[in-house]
Amino acid sequence: MIQSKNTHLSRADIIKNGSVFTRPELVDLVKSMVNDFISPSTIIGDFGSGYGAFIEKFKNCGLRCFGTELDDLSYNLLISEYPNINIYHENSLINISRDKYLLNENDDFIVVGNPPYNDTTSIFKKGEKGTLICDEDVVSRDFGVSFLKAYDKLHANYVCILHPLAYLIKKQNFNSLGRFKEHYKLLNATIFSSKEFESIKKSNSDFPVVAALYKKDDIGMTYEYIKQFEFNIFHSEKKFMLSKIETIDGIVEKYPKKNNKIGLQFYTLRDMNALLRNAGFVENRPSNGLEVNDDNLHQYCWLSFLKMNFKPSTNTFIFGNLSPLYTKKLEDPIFKNKIIAYAYNNIELIRKYYSMEKLEGLYGSLKTDYDELFLELKRLESLFE
């Protein structure tokens, strides 16, 4: 078997191609999830085969298997290692059809693998972006979403692949799945860290990836279905259910509005990764600053408290793509008072825009005991421990 590491690709090439090394343990996970649905007549396809980690695992399963690969060196290694398996040297998002892979209309067809994925609009921070060339009906901002749409176009009976968890748990991303979400239902899923991939271990922050098993289904799935779905966590007894996690969605503004007032602001925040990585309180940033006023000050002080102190000991990656965490304790006047006091004593910009007298007029005499704040923080940090 080929040692499946992308040693011939630069980091830029890895990003452009969406190429990552899939560890055997992750391939085994996919195999265990889909194995019960493979029959002697099943045909198995691996799109974006890399060096053949999934081909190796599934080569003796079902009736036959095939792979596809765009990268020249990977393709040549695949055809050398697997001369009896059809390997297509192609961009699999062009001219998508069952005929191309010798699939009849009624063939039992299962897709497995770790297809390329990357946001083609924001891959490179210095302006260079990936190029996605594909059939018009599978166009997406993300390679991975285009592959999911391609699997739907191929009418796969089951799909068991690795992809970013954000495709499912971020509502906008989920809606972008198009016909895939209308024709497939999630049956089983296990979350793991992107740092399980050798080629991106050195990235600054990891993000949640999911091994997901989907079944072709006339009803499909809704975002509410995903919110109530119980995800497994790799190497953990804990479970993840989106509906059980309190976030700021629908409560606190995350993106700037037009005609934002200048003055005290909070830097725009997409998710927990953005909150922890970017600035907190800022001033006079009309394009990327959220207006802070007397009514929402305690909410942004809470987010600033999170930013400064949130350090879970395990499974940190699960939080990354979630909207910033919220707590109903913010509705309690005493808890609110302590959050304001913490911000006043730790953030210079708060002291610049708010005097002690004004804050005490709004929230009462400020407390200096923060134990309750850190107890609530500890509860949130331990959600997935």
Positions of the model-derived regions?
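Class I S-adenosyl-L-methionine
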Residues: 1-79, 85-86, 91-96, 350-385
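Short catalytic/ligand-binding loop motif for oxyanion handling, primarily in non-cytosolic enzymes
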Residues: 55, 118-122, 167-172, 221-222
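Short amphipathic alpha-helix with an adjacent loop that forms part of the alpha/beta core around
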Residues: 94-107
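Conserved Class I SAM-dependent methyltransferase catalytic core
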Residues: 139-197, 212
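C-terminal target-recognition/interaction regions appended to catalytic cores
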Residues: 265-385
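Amphipathic alpha-helical repeat scaffolds
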Residues: 91, 111-118
